[in-house]
Regions:
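N-terminal leader segment of winged-helix/HTH proteins
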Residues: 1-42, 89, 169-171
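Short, hydrophobic-biased segments on the C-terminal half of alpha helices
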Residues: 63, 81-82
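N-terminal helix-turn-helix DNA-binding core of bacterial DNA-binding proteins
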Residues: 30-73, 160
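C-terminal regulatory/oligomerization modules of transcriptional regulators
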Residues: 1-12, 135-171
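Active-site phosphate/pyrophosphate-handling residues
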Residues: 16, 48, 139
Length: 171
């Protein structure tokens, strides 16, 4: 932006909508964190890692793909996976197809933890995200999220395609 140019300030309605959205961006993860701690004894990020692995083919993902899915730096993910390894829920090993990569695999105990934890997580997601919205609003939420993701990352479509391949999902 040109330093002499005046910023395009938000009007009153935009300010109000931004405030509501920004507050939701803080409160939704906090509510999911509280639920995961209360019901499963783990953090929401750890649950997200376990859940992602549970959906992956053979319950295994490259750490780099898992980092992308969780929108996390590899260092944060590595610390979380170390905690999960100590509980025998995940194990890591070099990727036999390409030793430059590390694979994270969900163990049987890890899968059992996901199966025990998932109902509470889904109930909380439903309570705070889906139940307050009509079906039309839910669809619109998905469209809005996609547009925002593309504004953040213009080639989001290719990121989405890589995630679908990693998880064995057809789009």
């Amino acid at each position: 932006m040109d330093e002499a140019a005046e910023p395009q300030w938000l009007d009153a309605e935009e300010q109000w909508n931004w405030f509501q959205f920004a507050y939701a961006l803080v409160r939704v993860p906090a509510a999911l964190e509280a639920q995961a701690q209360r019901d499963a004894g783990i953090g929401h990020f750890e649950y997200l890692v376990l859940s992602a692995l549970s959906m992956a083919p053979e319950h295994t993902l490259r750490m780099s793909d898992l980092a992308e899915f969780t929108a996390s730096a590899l260092s944060r993910l590595s610390n979380a996976v170390s905690r999960l390894e100590k509980r025998d829920w995940v194990h890591r090993e070099p990727d036999p197809a390409d030793g430059r990569y590390t694979l994270a695999t969900l163990t049987e105990d890890g899968l059992a933890k996901v199966e025990i934890s998932a109902p509470g997580h889904v109930a909380e997601v439903r309570r705070i995200v889906f139940d307050p919205l009509t079906k039309a609003q839910q669809r619109q939420l998905g469209v809005i999220a996609q547009r925002m993701l593309r504004a953040i990352e213009p080639d989001h479509t290719s990121v989405e395609e890589r995630a679908r391949r990693a998880f064995g999902v057809n789009g």
